[in-house]
Amino acid sequence: MDWLLLANRVLDGADITDDEALAILNCPDDELLLLLQGAYRIRKTYYGNKVKLNMIMNAKSGLCPENCGYCSQSSISTAPIPTYKMVNKETILQGAKRAYEAKIGTYCIVASGRGPSDKEIDIVVSAVKEIKETYGLKVCACLGILKPEQALRLKEAGVDRYNHNINTSKEHHPHITTSHTYDDRVRTVETVKEAGMSPCSGVIIGMKETKQDVIAMARSLKALDADSIPVNFLHAIDGTPLEGTKELNPRYCLKVLALFRYINPTKEIRISGGREVNLRSLQPLGLYAANSIFVGDYLTTAGQEKHADFQMLEDLGFDIDFAPASYAR
């Protein structure tokens, strides 16, 4: 396969075929750098050498009634994680201050559970208004399944983006959870779009899905027109049904990132949870396909030290995309 020719076709507006998508996932290791060169050509066209940085605030941990097999916060998990109800506004603001001082442009407020209560929405709305006035950061919320009126309140408060992952393909979804459907997740993404927020939706790779499932995920997100696509790589946690699952290697993870770039050329693609344990020493190469990362810790697992991420970006010669609103103090 001529990967640069394929990249040029994508830049000319063509969609890759299923055979070409499968060829990306089956790319011989000795062609991997050529594949990434093609992905980088696409990435650079739309994003240059800039990298978007995101930080997570785990605003509510554990206590979730859902039965997602990958998640340490689910009702069926026995993982020893911190559990607490929604934090107060001041705690959310403290996290935003840390993000601003670290030059992290997007602050992500995440809460466990099937969906937020109106009281939890009240806390987030109050915090977001002050974050916007004080720091001018972009704010992403991830609170579960939303009612239309809740989505409108978040939009009016200043939430820029709302995350609700599809996680896997529609066909594989029943193998991951039975407490909600794939269509439930899609409806929430549509609710977000209807409210005027930017839709963020992504996947988790390494949950015993097939390569055809991975291709279906990338195409589904294209059809949903998700502006931001977090690509997680399973960090199997003891005490979850997927405990001990180890299907991934760093080279395959890079091929997955390339696939998402070839299929979703104009979108923000973020290397998300599991980056450190799955890409390992090949983490820097991932940014030739992706243009965004999380900095700091994830929900219940530790991330790489911030200074190591900033050093990685400096070594790559990439620039941090940090442009808070001009009215921030």
Curated annotation (Swiss-Prot):
Keyword set includes S-adenosyl-L-methionine: yes
Any one of the GO BP annotations: biotin biosynthetic process
Database matches in SMART domains: BATS (SM00876), Elp3 (SM00729)
Function: Catalyzes the conversion of dethiobiotin (DTB) to biotin by the insertion of a sulfur atom into dethiobiotin via a radical-based mechanism.
Lineage start: Bacteria, Bacillati, Bacillota, Bacilli, Bacillales
HAMAP family: BioB (MF_01694)
Entry keyword S-adenosyl-L-methionine: yes
Originating gene: bioB
SUPFAM superfamilies xrefs: Radical SAM enzymes
Catalytic activity, reaction form: (4R,5S)-dethiobiotin + (sulfur carrier)-SH + 2 reduced [2Fe-2S]-[ferredoxin] + 2 S-adenosyl-L-methionine = (sulfur carrier)-H + biotin + 2 5'-deoxyadenosine + 2 L-methionine + 2 oxidized [2Fe-2S]-[ferredoxin]
EC code: 2.8.1.6
Enzyme class: transferase
Single GO molecular function: iron ion binding
Protein name (database record): Biotin synthase
InterPro entries associated with the record: Aldolase_TIM, BATS_dom, Biotin_synth/BioAB, Biotin_synthase, Elp3/MiaA/NifB-like_rSAM, rSAM
Cofactors, names only: [4Fe-4S] cluster; [2Fe-2S] cluster
PROSITE patterns, alphabetized: RADICAL_SAM
Family membership noted in the UniProt record: Belongs to the radical SAM superfamily. Biotin synthase family.
